[in-house]
UniProtKB/Swiss-Prot annotation:
GO terms for molecular function: ATP binding; ATP hydrolysis activity; ATP-dependent protein folding chaperone; protein dimerization activity; unfolded protein binding; zinc ion binding. It comes from the Bacteria. The gene is clpX. ATP binds at residues 122-129. This is ATP-dependent Clp protease ATP-binding subunit ClpX.
Amino acid sequence: MARIGDGGDLLKCSFCGKSQKQVKKLIAGPGVYICDECIDLCNEIIEEELADADDVKLDELPKPAEIRDFLEGYVIGQDTAKRTLAVAVYNHYKRIQAGEKARDSRAEPVELAKSNILMLGPTGCGKTYLAQTLAKMLNVPFAIADATALTEAGYVGEDVENILLKLIQAADYDVKRAETGIIYIDEVDKIARKSENPSITRDVSGEGVQQALLKILEGTQASVPPQGGRKHPHQEFIQIDTTNVLFIVAGAFAGLEKIVSDRVGKRGLGFGAEVHSKAEIDTQDHFAEVMPEDLIKFGLIPEFIGRLPVVASVTNLDKESLVKILSEPKNALVKQYTRLFEMDGVELEFAEDALEAIADQAIHRGTGARGLRAIMEEVLLPVMYDIPSRDDVAKVVVTKETVDDNVLPTIVPRKPSRSERRDKTA
């Protein structure tokens, strides 16, 4: 507590001049004092200056073409999805800036609605990686959540607010920064309604979760338990506004292609009927033709679909794309393993037909790009085990036979140095 100074005078704040009786708290420094009111004022000034510094100016915001080019350096193929995401993300952050300008001006603003994104496509085709790469480019907090772990409030499982806690943690508990972040919700197809018709029994992990997600998708002031878990009345909450949080929800939606083909495939009789063979229907890019009624039939409720106006579809990766994924991106698997071997002083080389064989195995397993690393680990495991203990290896060459026939990679021995040759002849 502040004390009465010598001579009976009350101590005063060195900044505003108020005495210790006029304020709640007076903090002493070397020959100076500051009151709690001045501390609050200084804190507000600093926060405003930091907010102005953190705001991304429109001319600094990457244009859609720049976003797509950045994604091109990391993700092979999926050009339509890249363009869709680039435009949606650019418009989202333009919308945030428009809202900030509207608050500063007195003119009646045109309110811009939020455009969350729904991504459809098979597993291992780059849905999660696209979202992660986007967040890396924009330097915004990014959180990944699994929809299968969620249940509606009051049941065993995670509340939807725990998704927001992951975003706050990704922003180092800076709530203001978290409020302009990106949340990626995976496996959203697993929370589809169990049947097309509403049931009289509760569907707590399906339709119930969709209902619980509606408010945070649209934008609401949510109360988040700081330690996660269930809410209880005696704990403090973190308040976060989700109005400017971009949600990207994604899923494989296995079976949706049949619903689309039933709608798109024209059936009829007579000379004017258009007939498609089963093979033609199977090879059509059905995800590109998805309509809201298809998603409703799949099990998503209309209110949930209405909050996801942007739909981006990814397609199965062919052999050529998988080979490119192995070698071309900035953090390609071949480059990663080459670096690992370099750290042991060994050169690693892949024959072109070896990369094709790895791609063939990934297609055969149905794991897409996600399965490439597992195959590489299987192929390289024996040499990665032996090489650190050896000093006579210069190069390891992986061939088609290594992949297909489970043969050990070719090991090229290191030529002995002059000193080693002299030691042998001595």
